[in-house]
Structure formats: structure tokens, C-alpha cells
Amino acid sequence: MAMGTRYAGKVVIVTGGGRGIGAGIVRAFVESGAQVVICDKDEARGRAVERELPGTVFLLCDVTREEDVRTLVSETIRRFGRLDCIVNNAGYHPPPQWPEETSAQGFRQLLELNLLGTYTLTKLALPHLRKSRGNVINISSLVGAIGQSQAVPYVATKGAVTAMTKALALDESQYGVRVNCISPGNIWTPLWEELAASTPDPTATIREGTLAQPLGRMGQPAEVAAAAVFLASEATFCTGTELLVTGGAELGYGRKAGQAAPAEAPTTPS
């Protein structure tokens, strides 16, 4: 693997780094010269990435457990003596469900992972990031801004991640710490494939996901990863930003009502 210098000598923690977007982010930072700590609660996946990529260290960690996260940060500092960037990528998108099918317990569990896991690592990492004038990168989602059918809990958690990013950026600017987020659209990952498989017609679901972008394809984890390295390195005048990596899925003006919705003709005001 060719090693770059864009982020040489820096130390990065990536949560959910065992597969999908997270693994892509780990790879991109390694290629940029950084030392990367892979955080994942799935040991087999994390170890596989560690074996593949020299310059990485895997630490077993469930971001919903604060003691795990404390150990993650302290062990990173013990091994490397510094911390320059955290990428809060760990998260989950449940299968489609209507609001009446959701439970308060399921909603809380998703909040613990998608939102509070991000908050906990950020809080515990900030003393070290302030020393290095480092940065925080949160992985949010396009649907946190534009909504998504049958995904109320997920949309709520990701909208909160984006809002938290902006608030943290204000608080941490006095220490020179930059806080930004990336909001991906449809990125082809194992999780996307699993979600499609849970629908009545996976092939049709994948086709719809592909055609949602004007570019006519889904994104790749490497494209989100490139955005993360950019925010950590060259984007030195960016904080509180939401960087969309969506293939333009949010663009345009089109049909929203379903087939069964009555098509009412507009009336002219009297």
C-alpha cells in the first residue's frame, strides 16, 4: 500500500471501523500516513481490518458502554501519546417500520448507539483533541435533514447528530478544535445490502436506491472516506459544516405522494 503524507504522524480513532463506511475511512487515513485505532464491537471484523492494514490497532469497544469508551481513549493515549482526530461512525439503520410498529425501547437503544455513542467518545476525547488542536468528524445521514419514510427513529437520531455537530463546533472553536459532519446518501455497504434483503423485493429496493441519485449509481465507502480525510487535513477553515456525499439525491422537485393518494386538481382562489 502506497503511504501518503496528508495526515502523517497523526493518530485517529474510527468507531464502527470493522466494515462498510468505517473500514473505508480506516483505509483512507492509513493511506494518508496516519496511525489508526479501529473501534468495533465485532472482534472478528475488527481483527480482519487490522490484519489487512499495517499501521492500525484494533480495540474491542461497544460505544454504548461508557467504560469501554474510556478504555478506548486511555489505551490510545497510552500507545501513541496523542490523539488528533476521532471519526464517530458507529451506527445502525433498522429495517423499515411504520411509526406504530416502533417501540420506545427500540428507539432508546438506537439513540444510545447513533447519538449518545457519538457524544460519549467526543466528550472523553476532547481533552486530548484540545492539546493537539485536532478535530471531530461525525457520520450523520442525508435523511437527518430531508426525512425518510418508515424510519422515524433513525432520522431523529441522525438529525440530532447534525445539530450536535454545530453546537460542539461553537463550544470547541475556542480551543482550535474543529467539529464537522458528513451526511452520506445511498452508499453501497453490507448494511445497505442487509436492509434491502429485509424488504419484500430486494432487487427492486436496490434499483430504487440506485436511481435516487442523478448520477445514476450508489456511492462507495471510499468516497465517504475521502471526504473524512479532507475534513481532517486540508479543510482547516471548516467547522460546524455538514458535508453532503449523496450523488445529488436531495436535488430536484418531484413526486412525493403514493399511487393510492387522490390527485386533487388545484383550485383558483376567488
Swiss-Prot record:
Which keywords fit this entry according to its UniProt record?
Answer: Carbohydrate metabolism, Cytoplasm, Fucose metabolism, Lipid metabolism, NAD, Oxidoreductase, Steroid metabolism
Q: Give, as in the UniProt entry, the pathway in which the protein acts.
A: Carbohydrate degradation; L-fucose degradation
What role does this protein play?
Catalyzes the NAD(+)-dependent oxidation of L-fucose, yielding L-fucono-1,5-lactone, which rapidly converts spontaneously to L-fucone-1,4-lactone. Can also act on D-arabinose and L-galactose, with lower catalytic efficiency. Does not use NADPH. May be the initial enzyme of the putative L-fucose degradation pathway in mammals.
Say which family it is in: Belongs to the short-chain dehydrogenases/reductases (SDR) family.
- Binding partners and assembly: Homotetramer.
Which species does this protein come from? Bos taurus (Bovine)
NCBIfam families reported for this sequence: PRK07231.1 (NF005559)
Molecular function GO terms recorded = D-threo-aldose 1-dehydrogenase activity; estradiol 17-beta-dehydrogenase [NAD(P)+] activity
Record-linked InterPro entries? NAD(P)-bd_dom_sf, Sc_DH/Rdtase_CS, SDR_fam
Q: What are its E.C. numbers?
A: 1.1.1.122
Active-site residues annotated for this sequence: 154
Please give the PROSITE patterns that the UniProt record associates with this protein. ADH_SHORT (PS00061)
Q: Which GO terms describe its biological process?
A: L-fucose catabolic process; steroid catabolic process
Which is one Gene Ontology cellular component term of this protein?
A: cytosol
Q: Does the keyword Cytoplasm apply?
A: yes
Task: Give the residues the record marks as binding NAD(+).
Answer: 19, 21, 40-41, 62-63, 89, 154, 158, 187, 189, 191
Q: Does the keyword Nucleotidyltransferase apply?
A: no
The entry's note on the tissues where this protein occurs is: Detected in retina.
What name appears for this protein in its UniProt entry?
L-fucose dehydrogenase
Main location as per UniProt: cytoplasm
Q: Which reaction does it catalyse?
A: L-fucose + NAD(+) = L-fucono-1,5-lactone + NADH + H(+); D-arabinose + NAD(+) = D-arabinono-1,5-lactone + NADH + H(+); L-galactose + NAD(+) = L-galactono-1,5-lactone + NADH + H(+)
Q: Give its localization.
A: Cytoplasm
